[in-house]
Amino acid sequence: SFTVEGLTDRQIVKYQKDFWSTLNDRNKVSKNILLNHHVRPVTVGEKRILRIDVPAADRHDKPVYIGTDPMKGTYKRDYEGDFLCTEEAVRAMFADQRDVSGDVEVLDEFGLDVLNQDTIKGYRIIFEQLHSGHPWNALENDEFLMKLRAAAKNKKGTLSPTIAGLLFFGEAYRITEVFPNYFLDYREECNDKAVRWLFRTHSNEGDWSGNIYDFFCKVRTRIDDDVAVPFANRRDGYRVDRVDVHDALEEALANALAHANYYGRRGILVVKKGKELSISNPGTIRVTKEEFYAGGNSDPRNPNILKMFGFVNVGERAGSGVDKIMTAWAEQNWKKPEFDFSERSDRVTLKLEV
């Protein structure tokens, strides 16, 4: 337990002066993100103390570090205290500073032959069904991919995939040339410890493309078939076999794929065990938790990937996905979805009752 000893007025003035002096010394702290109201004297019982509130740093300011070396002076705080960030986590913070979408970067060293033609064909079929009469439907594949910003002209004037295009339509073995830790994994597990899993598919199997769009389609089918929700009825009396729960699940999966840091370790992991589904992606959220739950400002790490999902009616560009998930689960009277924001492992995990 702690005992409040209190400070004198003179001590408060001195500590405030010393604190601000240190905080504004660039040899000691990389950036001062505090304002005057964050440091103020307060009364606890009959004792005076100095209260310091440290706000969450905006992604444009991260990393905020001690000393002059970000690799040795960047710390994060979790429920157990402060811990030194890995160099990988620090590099991810620098990458997240950019406002320009990183997933539209052109991969000059690749041609469009690294993309899977069957994936593109399947995507275009869905696109045409949803957007009949759209002018893009008449385009050749190369032009269509350019409209999606899945491809662009490289320095030589020929076409190359963008990062979004490679991840969305590419072959897994070519994706790992850019993202060595890239791995997409879906498992169906049971409580029998003698059985590792009931079903599994992952991006390194070799008998399918391994890209994020085909992974999404494969996993969506498995999840849709197992979700026990009642049929919904339209006003005309006909029933429909898809309700908000299915849409919310699709959005949760698409959001994980669009918000993932593909340079991070361990990749995407989706696990279904009994009535629980967990969806985990590398990369922490780029907004505050309050903004995350409020919706309207999702700030995706890979916005063009989210846009390509949006063209086939998956995902919410406006950032209302969390609200949709919460509402859908509440309507079914299911357990409230849980988000785990792991600072140590730089991952976000969503746990759902299905």
Predicted regions and their residues:
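Conserved N-box helix within the HATPase_c
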Residues: 248
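Active-site alpha-helix of zinc metalloproteases
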Residues: 251
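Conserved N-terminal catalytic/coupling substructures associated with nucleotide/phosphate chemistry
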Residues: 1-245, 254-354
